[in-house]
From Swiss-Prot:
<protein>
    <recommendedName>
        <fullName>4-dimethylallyltryptophan N-methyltransferase ifgB</fullName>
        <ecNumber>2.1.1.261</ecNumber>
    </recommendedName>
</protein>
<keyword id="KW-0017">Alkaloid metabolism</keyword>
<keyword id="KW-0808">Transferase</keyword>
<comment type="subunit">
    <text>Homodimer.</text>
</comment>
<comment type="similarity">
    <text>Belongs to the methyltransferase superfamily.</text>
</comment>
<dbReference type="GO" id="GO:0032259">
    <property type="term" value="P:methylation"/>
</dbReference>
<dbReference type="InterPro" id="IPR017805">
    <property type="entry name" value="SAM_MeTrfase_EasF-type_put"/>
</dbReference>
<dbReference type="InterPro" id="IPR029063">
    <property type="entry name" value="SAM-dependent_MTases_sf"/>
</dbReference>
<dbReference type="InterPro" id="IPR017804">
    <property type="entry name" value="MeTrfase_EgtD-like"/>
</dbReference>
<comment type="function">
    <text>4-dimethylallyltryptophan N-methyltransferase; part of the gene cluster that mediates the biosynthesis of isofumigaclavines, fungal ergot alkaloids. The tryptophan dimethylallyltransferase ifgA catalyzes the first step of ergot alkaloid biosynthesis by condensing dimethylallyl diphosphate (DMAP) and tryptophan to form 4-dimethylallyl-L-tryptophan. The second step is catalyzed by the methyltransferase ifgB that methylates 4-dimethylallyl-L-tryptophan in the presence of S-adenosyl-L-methionine, resulting in the formation of N-methyl-dimethylallyl-L-tryptophan.</text>
</comment>
<dbReference type="InterPro" id="IPR051128">
    <property type="entry name" value="EgtD_Methyltrsf_superfamily"/>
</dbReference>
<keyword id="KW-0489">Methyltransferase</keyword>
<dbReference type="GO" id="GO:0008168">
    <property type="term" value="F:methyltransferase activity"/>
</dbReference>
<dbReference type="Pfam" id="PF10017">
    <property type="entry name" value="Methyltransf_33"/>
</dbReference>
<dbReference type="GO" id="GO:0035835">
    <property type="term" value="P:indole alkaloid biosynthetic process"/>
</dbReference>
<dbReference type="InterPro" id="IPR019257">
    <property type="entry name" value="MeTrfase_dom"/>
</dbReference>
<comment type="pathway">
    <text>Alkaloid biosynthesis; ergot alkaloid biosynthesis.</text>
</comment>
Length: 340
């Protein structure tokens, strides 16, 4: 375990857990009410998410894996030799492993980092890797947020001047509103691609499926309910780390709600009360959730061709390559900064 821990670099600019209660309070004090995504990615939350995302009906993961297994050799051709490759969100490396194996086969000198908020999940991820297979690809991990990772690439001697390739798998960009997705990509580009724009890129996945039945089956698959409710236990821990005082949330008061928003082209995930008014506890006991009120915690935007081009263009990026396989709604795109 000591060897594994030595591979993990702490790049946190602040302890993100400290800010989550403030984000929870702010989100529940507005209309419509929301909960921050960070609340859902505790160690327990991530384990439930992995169970959910590996369910048979959760097509995004299965389609990503099909594409990566079929097209990884082509995809690594787009990654420059001597690159630093960062997976911005590595709850599981099963999707990245085909890419690492293809990079090793190409004999490119690559330094790969898995980035995650959870130290324990990074430990688990690194323990599962077959290091003996890799001679050209060096493997490590970064403990921090997306923002920490991008800043680390920009500022770190010995890293900042090398080509960068950032992986945004798992439909990560779809979790942001369309304007915020463009800003997110623009921030990555200006900080992590600008030093070597010709050789640096983003590899991301997007989903074009707008068939309500397929989407709803996926996002109500096994594991999603415990994933959603684990956030409430995590919230209780953050508001009362010593387990003293009244709980903010009673998980037994809540249902998970899954909806397709046809007008906005997105899936919406919310928590609702079990048909009754709920007053929160502890420091949030002045907040009341009405019986028909939704607390949204996640959206997954789907992108058709026109929406993709608006997204990339608004971020100052251009898609230079695309990879998919027949029958898949998911595709991977290589993005680079637009020439001046």
């Amino acid at each position: 375990m000591t060897i594994i821990n030595s591979r993990i670099i702490d790049i946190r600019q602040s302890t993100f857990e400290e800010s989550i209660p403030d984000q929870v309070t702010a989100g529940l004090s507005t209309t419509p009410k929301t909960l921050p995504a960070l609340l859902f990615y505790s160690g327990e939350g991530i384990r439930h998410w992995i169970e959910h995302s590996t369910a048979a009906d959760f097509y995004p993961r299965h389609e990503e894996l099909r594409i990566l297994r079929a097209r990884a050799a082509e995809m690594v051709d787009s990654i420059a030799n001597n690159s630093v490759v960062v997976d911005l969100g590595s709850a599981s490396l099963d999707k990245v492993l085909p890419l690492l194996e293809a990079l090793e086969a190409s004999k490119k000198n690559i330094t790969f980092y898995a980035l995650d908020l959870s130290f324990s999940e990074l430990q688990s991820t690194l323990q599962s890797l077959p290091y003996e297979q890799f001679k050209f690809v060096k493997i490590g991990a970064l403990h921090g947020t997306f923002e920490d990772g991008v800043q680390w690439l920009k500022d770190t001697p010995g890293v900042q001047d090398r080509p960068h390739c950032l992986l945004l798998f798992g439909l990560t960009v779809g979790n942001y509103s369309r304007p915020n997705a463009a800003k997110f990509l623009q921030n990555i580009a200006s900080n992590a691609l600008a030093a070597s724009p010709v050789q640096s890129s983003i590899l991301l996945s997007l989903d074009s499926c707008k068939m309500p039945t397929k989407v709803l089956r996926a996002y109500t698959a096994e594991g999603v309910v415990p994933f959603a409710l684990a956030s409430l236990d995590y919230g209780n821990t953050l508001f009362a780390p010593n387990k003293m005082g009244e709980k903010v949330f009673q998980p037994s008061d809540w249902y998970f709600l899954s909806e397709w928003n046809y007008m906005l082209g997105r899936h919406e995930a919310s928590l609702i009360t079990k048909g009754k008014e709920v007053r929160l506890g502890g420091p949030l006991n002045d907040i009341v959730i009405e019986k028909h009120e939704k607390i949204r915690f996640g959206c997954s935007y789907k992108y058709d061709t026109d929406e993709r081009q608006v997204l990339f263009g608004s971020a100052g990026l251009t898609d230079v390559k695309e990879w998919s396989v027949e029958g898949c709604d998911v595709s991977f795109y290589q993005l680079q900064m637009c020439p001046n």
